[in-house]
């Protein structure tokens, strides 16, 4: 290479660092940051489906991500074998996602702290009632610049009214807020019309990432999840994205009740519409300033429709009506050790609405809780819909 093409110092004998940066570019040829290490916290049906995606994308972007993806697994014995060993040896979650191969760079780790050690990105995908306990075990164990993203569809009810300005919200705390409050790190969210079995089958679908620091964190998170069949859109309205993901499970319970009662698609359509109306009002009341456009993302109307026709909450609530069994019995029979988040979210939503005197303004949400709690008969739901304030 001729001297005219190489930046040199005045004495032409050695290169200055600034000259090298000007020649090569500070962000391209010379790498200033090591690849990000990713940990998936959770290994259920949804967590394992997401692991298939993340395991693939991390290998596709070796400059951005470390190729090894650690997945925290709550150890179980399945057919006489440790689940973690089955995942690591046969690359299959035989309990929660049987028949689907996990990428060989996804490594099951049973120790929570060990699974997160040195990680730069934490993907939370566990039932929402376990988040607080998990985060408390990680306090002081992760760097302050760690990014987190929650795929958890639920909310936290703060009975003490302590923490993130929850008093004016009747104790409402988003899962992302709970993670951020405990771990002191930035938290984004991913929600959408994403039934786990279909995602695992690589069926085309969309998802929404809610990222308050869209310019700083959005591009990396999109690379982590975006594929040909899992299309990601990033928005800044993270609170709305997250609440849509939580509240749609409550509406899906109502849809399941109407299915169990033998009503048709017209009635279910009414449930979906009224549920959407209550969702938009709930978001605007507790988190003023939401963007209406967010409800038209995958996290909004699309997820609501999908869950009311195909989700586990609908399925469980239909069986609850038809069999007369308790919710716990139905979950045990139908969900293979997992739980429906709708009934618990409905209870938490009701408690915070009741505390702020708003339960009468959200009759569908209120009815779902009371039916799940045995305080109202499922057949009374239609009367609730018939007398909804939207019809007055």
UniProtKB/Swiss-Prot annotation:
Major site of localization recorded for this protein: cytoplasm
SUPFAM superfamilies: 6-phosphogluconate dehydrogenase C-terminal domain-like, NAD(P)-binding Rossmann-fold domains
InterPro entries: 6-PGluconate_DH-like_C_sf, 6PGD_dom2, G3P_DH_NAD-dep, G3P_DH_NAD-dep_C, G3P_DH_NAD-dep_euk, G3P_DH_NAD-dep_N, NAD(P)-bd_dom_sf
GO annotation terms (biological process): carbohydrate metabolic process; glycerol-3-phosphate catabolic process; glycerol-3-phosphate metabolic process; hyperosmotic response; intracellular accumulation of glycerol
Cellular localisation: Cytoplasm
Catalytic residues (positions): 248
Keyword S-adenosyl-L-methionine: no
Example of a GO cellular component annotation carried by this entry: cytosol
Reaction(s) this enzyme catalyzes, per UniProt: sn-glycerol 3-phosphate + NAD(+) = dihydroxyacetone phosphate + NADH + H(+)
This enzyme's EC code(s): 1.1.1.8
A GO molecular-function descriptor: protein homodimerization activity
Pfam families assigned: NAD_Gly3P_dh_C, NAD_Gly3P_dh_N
Family to which this protein belongs: Belongs to the NAD-dependent glycerol-3-phosphate dehydrogenase family.
PANTHER family linked to this entry: GLYCEROL-3-PHOSPHATE DEHYDROGENASE, GLYCEROL-3-PHOSPHATE DEHYDROGENASE [NAD(+)]-RELATED
Assembly, per entry: Homodimer.
UniProt-recorded name of the protein: Probable glycerol-3-phosphate dehydrogenase 2
């Amino acid at each position: 290479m001729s001297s005219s093409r190489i930046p040199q110092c005045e004495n032409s004998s050695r290169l200055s660092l600034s000259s090298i940066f000007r020649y090569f570019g500070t962000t391209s040829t010379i790498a200033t940051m090591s690849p990000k290490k990713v940990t998936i916290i959770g290994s259920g049906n949804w967590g394992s489906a997401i692991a298939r995606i993340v395991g693939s994308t991390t290998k596709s972007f070796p400059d951005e991500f470390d190729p090894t993806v650690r997945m925290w697994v709550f150890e179980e014995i399945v057919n006489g074998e440790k689940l973690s060993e089955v995942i690591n040896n046969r690359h299959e979650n035989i309990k929660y996602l049987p028949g689907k191969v996990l990428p060989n760079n996804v490594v099951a780790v049973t120790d929570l702290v060990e699974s997160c050690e040195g990680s730069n990105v934490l993907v939370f995908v566990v039932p929402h009632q376990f988040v607080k306990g998990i985060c408390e075990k990680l306090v002081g164990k992760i760097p302050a610049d760690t990014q987190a993203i929650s795929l958890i569809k639920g909310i936290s009810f703060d009975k003490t009214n302590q923490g993130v300005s929850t008093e004016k919200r009747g104790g409402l705390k988003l899962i992302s807020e709970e993670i951020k409050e405990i771990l002191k790190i930035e938290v984004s969210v991913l929600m959408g019309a994403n039934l786990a079995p279909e995602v695992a089958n690589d069926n085309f679908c969309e998802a929404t990432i809610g990222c308050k620091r869209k310019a700083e964190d959005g591009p990396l998170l999109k690379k982590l999840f975006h594929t040909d069949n899992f299309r990601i859109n990033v928005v800044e309205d993270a609170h709305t994205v997250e609440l849509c993901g939580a509240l749609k499970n409550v509406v899906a319970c109502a849809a399941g009740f109407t299915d169990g009662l033998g009503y048709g698609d017209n009635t279910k359509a009414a449930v979906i519409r009224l549920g959407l109306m209550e969702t938009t009002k709930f978001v605007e009341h507790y988190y003023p300033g939401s963007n209406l456009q967010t409800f038209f993302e995958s996290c909004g109307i699309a997820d609501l429709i999908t869950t009311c026709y195909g989700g586990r909450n609908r399925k469980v609530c239909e069986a609850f009506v038809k069999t007369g069994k308790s919710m716990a019995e139905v979950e045990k029979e139908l969900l293979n050790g997992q739980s429906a988040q709708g009934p618990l979210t409905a209870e938490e939503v009701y408690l915070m609405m009741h505390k702020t005197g708003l339960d009468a303004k959200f009759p569908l949400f209120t009815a779902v809780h009371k039916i799940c709690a045995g305080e109202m008969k499922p057949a009374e739901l239609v009367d609730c819909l018939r007398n909804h304030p939207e019809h007055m």
